[in-house]
A protein has these predicted regions:
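N-terminal active-site segment of His-dependent metallophosphoesterases
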Residues: 1-72, 172
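Active-site glycine-centered loops adjacent to acidic/histidine catalytic or metal-binding residues
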Residues: 11, 64-65, 97-98, 198, ...
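Beta-strand-turn-beta hairpins that frame and shape the catalytic cleft
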Residues: 1-7, 16-19, 143-158, 188, ...
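Extended active-site neighborhood of metal-dependent phosphoesterases/phosphodiesterases
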Residues: 72, 77-180, 251, 272, ...
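Short, solvent-exposed aromatic-acidic interface loops
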Residues: 284-295
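His/acidic metal-ligating clusters that form di-metal
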Residues: 53-59, 91, 155-157, 166-256, ...
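Short catalytic/ligand-binding loop motif for oxyanion handling, primarily in non-cytosolic enzymes
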Residues: 15-17, 68-71, 101-105, 165-167, ...
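Non-catalytic terminal accessory segments
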Residues: 1, 294-442
Length: 442
């Protein structure tokens, strides 16, 4: 691949400052939201200003979920920021995704959630024409997928798997045929190609393979199509996670999926990627950092992490709540136990041996820490750590349940080892970092 460098950021979820973000309805919503809404405009502006100051890198790529929920005012505000960034000399390429058009455009005022003007999928082309579409050498009207030659001999295949006219995360047969046609054309023109897609193609962590909305549908077929037709790198988002994963097709061809976190929520990273004349690709993660708000002495990363951790915990507790009769009673007891118990308490109830250093830790704190660590990348709780050993013993205790579940998870002839998937989700066995990595491309 010819030398190229660019900034990669995704899931900006821009929310226009002119829209309301206050009151009880907003506060209740934020209890389960992993990323910031009120702060989003300042975060985007701050990061864009920093990127604008880099005079050596002139390409910026943003793979979808540009706004909170397609609010018309949010699109206007975000596009204004894009134009300011373009004036600094940057070439900007975007794709849109489900949060950029839907039926859930709201603001929050006077303790209420109020509907505001949204955006249709058909409007997105004209709104973002100057940020990729106008430079397209091939364009798929149904999905707004496109191909652009971002520098001499290097083309970007922008796959929109989140269009209005198909199930979310779908690269259907028609679009696959279009993709193959574009890759064959690039090869005949002597160009190398990398791809972008909002949804991860390769599941970011093993357990996400079981979650339909966590990766593209029929992901192995899509990954093989790309790898076997010359695409070695795809840049993704959607899951708000820092991850880098490799997939090899049956023909032995590799695809590297670089998934980047939400810009406005923990882990709050963006990336700078360079490919040199020897086809060495370097991936660097950059902290969002200070964005000009008074955080009352709280460190910026802690500010992001606290919101994320609390939201994860609240979602789990909310999932356990509700129900009627015996089921409701059991769920209520489980929720109460999780809120109050330490890890040591749980270990005694289940007769599980744990490291004494974990015993006094609140169970809610451990859940938040593990969840946050998964999304930050590099999943530190590998074999040999107290956390890994505790989870392993917990899963062993419930092995009879897992064995009953596993056959139901089998799909397309692929059997699942649920215990292994869960343990490899909290502890990485990759030979490279999810944050900063280096690969030699073909």
């Amino acid at each position: 691949m010819n030398p190229v460098g660019f900034y990669l950021l995704t899931d900006t979820h821009y929310f226009a400052p002119c829209l309301g973000a206050e009151g009880k309805a907003f506060e209740n919503y934020m209890k389960k939201e992993q990323y910031f809404i009120k702060e989003s405009a300042s975060i985007v502006e701050s990061v864009f200003n920093r990127i604008a100051d880099d005079k050596e890198t002139d390409i910026v790529i943003i793979p979808g979920d540009l706004t909170k929920n397609g609010e018309k005012e949010s699109h206007k505000g975000f596009i204004n920021e894009l134009y300011k960034l373009r004036e600094s000399g940057k070439k900007i390429y975007v794709i849109t995704a489900g949060h950029d058009y839907n039926e859930w455009s709201y603001e929050y005022r006077n303790d209420e959630r109020l509907e505001v003007e949204g955006t249709s999928f058909d409007e997105l082309y004209d709104l973002y024409r100057d940020f990729g579409y106008a430079d397209a050498i091939a364009f798929d009207k149904l999905t707004h997928s496109y191909v652009a030659e971002i520098t001499g001999g290097v083309r970007m295949l922008a796959i929109n798997c989140d269009a209005w006219n198909q199930p979310k995360g779908t690269v259907d047969e028609r679009l696959r045929a279009w993709i193959k046609e574009q890759l064959e054309k690039a090869k005949s023109d002597g160009c190398s190609v990398f791809a972008i897609c909002h949804y991860p193609v390769i599941p970011s962590v093993p357990v996400f393979d079981l979650v339909g909305d966590a990766r593209v549908n029929e992901w192995r077929r899509v990954a093989s199509l790309l790898a076997d037709n010359g695409v070695e790198v795809i840049l993704t988002g959607h899951m708000h996670i820092q991850s880098i994963n490799e997939f090899y097709s049956e023909n032995g061809n590799r695809l590297i999926d670089i998934c980047t976190s939400c810009l406005v929520g923990s882990p709050a990273k963006y990336r700078k990627i360079t490919i040199d004349e020897k086809s060495v690709m370097k991936v660097e993660s950059i902290d969002v950092g200070d964005f000009g708000w008074n955080l009352n002495g709280v460190e910026v990363q802690d500010y992001f992490d606290e919101q994320f951790g609390q939201a994860i915990l609240n979602k789990i507790l909310n999932a356990l709540s509700g129900g009627k009769g015996a089921v409701g009673f059991i769920r209520k007891c489980a929720t109460k136990f999780i809120r109050k118990a330490t890890v040591g308490t749980l270990s005694r109830v289940l007769f599980i041996r744990i490291d004494k250093n974990l015993a006094k830790k609140k169970l809610t704190a451990l859940i938040s820490e593990i969840g946050l660590a998964i999304f930050k990348g590099d999943r530190p709780y590998a074999d040999g750590t107290p956390e890994y050993d505790a989870v392993s013993r917990l899963l062993r205790r419930f092995s009879f349940v897992i064995k009953k579940i596993e056959p139901k998870l089998e799909k397309d002839g692929v059997k699942r080892n649920l215990k292994e998937m869960l343990l490899n989700t909290i502890g990485s066995n990759n030979g490279f970092s999810d944050a900063n990595a280096e690969f030699v491309l073909k």
